[in-house]
Amino acid sequence: MIRHFLRDDDLSPTEQAEVLQLAAELKREPFSRRPLDGPRGVAVIFDKNSTRTRFSFEMGIAQLGGHAVVVDGRSTQLGREETLPDTAKVLSRFVDAIVWRTFGQDRLQAMASTATVPVVNALSDEFHPCQVLADLQTITERRGSLKGLRLSYFGDGANNMAHSLMLGGVTAGMHVTIAAPDGFHPDPSVVGAAEQRAETTGASVRLTADAHVAAAGADVLVTDTWTSMGQEDDGLDRVKPFRPFQVNEQLLAAADSEVVVLHCLPAHRGDEITDQVMDGPASAVWDEAENRLHAQKALLVWLLERGR
């Protein structure tokens, strides 16, 4: 049966654990799985600029024995002279999977509605599930079991990382806190979905406007840019409300002594995170970036093996 990965709760807790275990295996033995030998192809479409997503998917697909057909979405007929469902039918005849970094989540859903190969969300305005798989792999490397850990996110609670951390974190059995200024809290429908999943895993979701409450005793501190792609024009207006949510040495001191600090990058040093924290011993940012490669390879292997 064809499976898609459009948002973090598309994987059950057991399935998420399987992907993370496979990611660890592929990090140890990068060329041990070759499901794309042939070479077989994967469409990798970018409607938004990318560094880590492009490099990690291109290299990962090559290590799996395949060929990445990388396309700028603006140079195709996607959603313009051809409908997304029609495009999905066509691409499904050419490639073994479709990886898409785009805008609205509805575009991914339209693509997946008729695709006969797996569709993977490489980032949308609402979710960033591949990044959170890499985050969970990184936390596992530093702290062991994920279940019961306290993860706190600081910044724009309405952005894709906050949404995905809630869904992915509670799927892993973590207690997730979103610390954001008033007016920047997560989509209530995503909070509801996370709470529903949390009921099955013993996890919890908490929203707060107090960064120090969120940091107290936390095992993981996560932040992201205060201004997401497409919001650059109002970047200066965001500095004042977000300044109390900067991940700095004061917040770090309130957290657990073995706290792990994550940032999906690119980082605006001195805004959402200080140099001292980002370059300090608690930071796992560079391992986190590398793990995009391993987590995404594992996801592709998992999806492809279930679709055959």
Swiss-Prot record:
Subcellular location(s) of the protein: Cytoplasm
Record's keyword terms, sorted: Amino-acid biosynthesis, Arginine biosynthesis, Cytoplasm, Transferase
Catalytic activity: carbamoyl phosphate + L-ornithine = L-citrulline + phosphate + H(+)
UniProt xrefs under Pfam families: OTCace, OTCace_N
Naturally occurring in which organism (per UniProt): Mycobacterium ulcerans (strain Agy99)
Upper taxonomic lineage: Bacteria, Bacillati, Actinomycetota, Actinomycetes, Mycobacteriales
Binding site for carbamoyl phosphate: S50, T51, R52, T53, Q77, R101, H128, P129, C130, Q131, C264, L265, R292
SUPFAM superfamilies: Aspartate/ornithine carbamoyltransferase
Tree of life domain: Bacteria
Enzyme Commission number(s) from the entry: 2.1.3.3
Family membership noted in the UniProt record: Belongs to the aspartate/ornithine carbamoyltransferase superfamily. OTCase family.
Pathway given in the UniProt record: Amino-acid biosynthesis; L-arginine biosynthesis; L-arginine from L-ornithine and carbamoyl phosphate: step 1/3
Primary role: Reversibly catalyzes the transfer of the carbamoyl group from carbamoyl phosphate (CP) to the N(epsilon) atom of ornithine (ORN) to produce L-citrulline.
Biological processes per GO annotation: arginine biosynthetic process via ornithine; citrulline biosynthetic process; L-arginine biosynthetic process
Keyword Kinase: no
Positions bound to L-ornithine: N160, D224, S228, M229
PROSITE patterns membership: CARBAMOYLTRANSFERASE (PS00097)
Positions of disulphide bridges: none
Keyword Transport: no
GO CC terms in record: cytoplasm
GO-annotated molecular function: amino acid binding; ornithine carbamoyltransferase activity
InterPro entries: Asp/Orn_carbamoyltranf_P-bd, Asp/Orn_carbamoylTrfase, Asp/Orn_carbamoylTrfase_sf, Asp_carbamoyltransf_Asp/Orn-bd, Orn/put_carbamltrans, OTCase_ArgI
Record's protein name: Ornithine carbamoyltransferase
